[in-house]
Amino acid sequence: MRKALLISLILPILIGGLVAAAQAPQDTPQGFMGINIGAGLAVGLAAIGAGVAVGTAAAAGIGVLTEKREMFGTVLIFVAIGEGIAVYGIIFAVLMLFAGI
């Protein structure tokens, strides 16, 4: 079951990158080096990682908040750290597409 879920999450990202790479002219950096596929993988895998991190941190945070309401700020910081993973993936993808890394 988990293999099917993982494949169903990754397959649309790969297909989208392949379609974008096929439409780009071959003389541009995006079409020649497959940067579109790399950018799609960067965003997709970072979003999956952020989802896992936020889900785990939020579940633990709810448990903490039921016992100690004053820990809200700390829980919010831990959940925000998990969201940072997705932001880094988006930044890296933009750098790949426009700076030609």
Swiss-Prot record:
Molecular-function annotations in GO: ATP binding; hydrolase activity; lipid binding; proton-transporting ATPase activity, rotational mechanism
Pfam families per UniProt: ATP-synt_C (PF00137)
Record keywords, A-Z: ATP-binding, Cell membrane, Hydrogen ion transport, Hydrolase, Ion transport, Lipid-binding, Membrane, Nucleotide-binding, Transmembrane, Transmembrane helix, Transport
Domain of life: Archaea
Cellular localization per UniProt: Cell membrane
Keyword match Ion transport: yes
Residue ranges of the TM segments: 4-24, 32-52, 75-95
Record-linked InterPro entries: ATPase_proteolipid_c-like_dom, ATPase_proteolipid_csu, F/V-ATP_Csub_sf
Keyword S-adenosyl-L-methionine carried by entry: no
Protein topology in the membrane: Multi-pass membrane protein
GO cellular component assignments: plasma membrane; proton-transporting V-type ATPase, V0 domain
SUPFAM superfamilies: F1F0 ATP synthase subunit C (SSF81333)
Protein family (similarity comment): Belongs to the V-ATPase proteolipid subunit family.
Subunit composition and interactions: Has multiple subunits with at least A(3), B(3), C, D, E, F, H, I and proteolipid K(x).
Purpose of the protein: Component of the A-type ATP synthase that produces ATP from ADP in the presence of a proton gradient across the membrane.
Protein name: A-type ATP synthase subunit K
Source organism of this protein record: Sulfolobus acidocaldarius (strain ATCC 33909 / DSM 639 / JCM 8929 / NBRC 15157 / NCIMB 11770)
